[in-house]
Amino acid sequence: MKRMICVLGLACVSLGVAAQQSFPTSQKEDKEQIMSEAYWKIWNPSVQKQIDQDIEKYRKANGVVFLEEAVPGTSVQIKQVSHDFVFGASMFNFNQLGTPAANQRYKELFGTLFNRATVPFYWEPFEMQPGRPRFREEYWDTEAYWNRQENPKYQPHWRRPAPDPMIAYCESHGVPVHGHPLTWGSRRWQHPNWIVDQILTDEERETLKQYVAEYADEKNFLNGDKMTPAFEKATLAELEAKLPELGPKLQKLIDKRITEIVKYYGDRVSSWDVVNESAQDYAKGAMVPGSKLCKSNYGFMPGDYTFEAFKTTASVVSENALMNINDYWGGPEYAEQIKDLQKRGARIDVAGSQMHLFDPKQCLDIAAGKEIQTPTQIWKLMNSLTETGLPIHLSEITITSPGSDLKGQQIQAVIAQNLYRLWFSCKNMMGITWWNVVDDCGAPGEPSVSGLFFRDMSPKLSYYALENLINHAWKTETEVKAGKNGEVKFRGFRGNYEITYTDKAGNEQTVTYHLK
């Protein structure tokens, strides 16, 4: 794209008209040197040309439609109304933004900018009490409750709404739902603290004292349990001998959770992150087929828990729902793990890959020209994942603005523009999901400036960057002439179209068409 992106007049979801501001899309446009010369050298015209060529090659297709009643030589209007490609976002702040107006603006993004919503199923806040999953809305999930909270982030279910009302909203607006995550080893964000008391005998709890120095929770900010030197020294066989039932008990509990959630929603959830962030355990050889325990990076996990999670999910999931694996791991071990699981018979439909620039300094470094998330690095990772033969979902995307001032917004917008274009151009890419949509609405410890919107739901420049790409640059709208026998040919982005023409009787007709 060789023109300056101006946000004047680009209004969406009742956001109103923004002040006239812009951000550069090339070094030639960057008169104020928002980005360094070194940055533009990395994202040079040759790279941009390759991206454009790959978008044309991988994201578009040729359409042929026969309109029997169309008069040859007359005009036919071709208008794309939706994408096959997934442009998603997490919906974690549903009804939690403090005012009806902010909540309404947030919800309306789903179906206008975003065509898929990631809905949270983190175990600890979803099942705070054993046997009492939070499917349905209770008072503390309502907009009225959240509007009264002075410090909403201190609530235990912040960013973890009950899923029923979220999914109902998505269904009413034609937005598919992605469930995240079913299985994850994280103690801080996933495993409930009640597990230890619920499934362990007194003897097992006493034995665990040798190996667990401190259990992770929301207060100590540990992602995994703090293990003792004895745990690190012990062999897997020694641990299994001392705790022979621990792994099977954990697996049984995980299987119960998967079965309950997946059966409850059936076809209403179109895809699931079956396992989240397990590649590190695979990379260090901790998951051993046939074993009862895994010496996980998080602490004790069931042996071979990734394979077991896919096996359990496959036994209960709808045939229409996709089963994803998801990870931040950037090394070759992630693709190797997927191929190993496939070889052993695991059904995996999509490879999820995360990209979080959580530290605002990272974006300053990128603007300065440091080699962080460069085209070469991204192509290498995507090519590695392509070897699995799976579609790729950029499942969690964080791009921070170094500040809330104009320059900080411009840096975020430029980085988002170039990264989205590159990701969109990758051969096996099927979707990109932005993580925190609103500033200051992430999880504790995450940056407060990673949104597309300020806290009051006023748009940042990064919003306009994405809105222009998704709803303008990457949507096909053209006019062609009807050929003989009403044949209509066009080339466009894959998705659903409305095709409008005047029939032989002089009446306007509209047909729908899916370009695959």
Give the location of each predicted region.
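Conserved, mostly hydrophobic/aromatic
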Residues: 65, 117, 170, 261, ...
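Aromatic-rich peripheral "rim/lid" segments of glycoside hydrolase catalytic domains that contact
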Residues: 28-41, 197-218, 222, 228-236, ...
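Beta-strand-rich domain onsets/edges
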Residues: 21-96, 116, 128-129, 135-136, ...
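Active-site beta-loop-alpha junctions enriched in small/polar residues
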Residues: 90-94, 122, 182-184, 274-277, ...
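Aromatic-lined substrate-binding rim segments of carbohydrate-active enzymes
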Residues: 111-114, 120-237, 241, 252-254, ...
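Hydrophobic h-region of N-terminal signal peptides that target proteins for export
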Residues: 10-18
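Glycoside hydrolase catalytic-domain groove-lining segments
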Residues: 136, 143, 157-176, 287-404, ...
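Short Pro-Gly-centered beta-turn/loop motif in secreted/extracellular proteins
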Residues: 99-113, 489-498
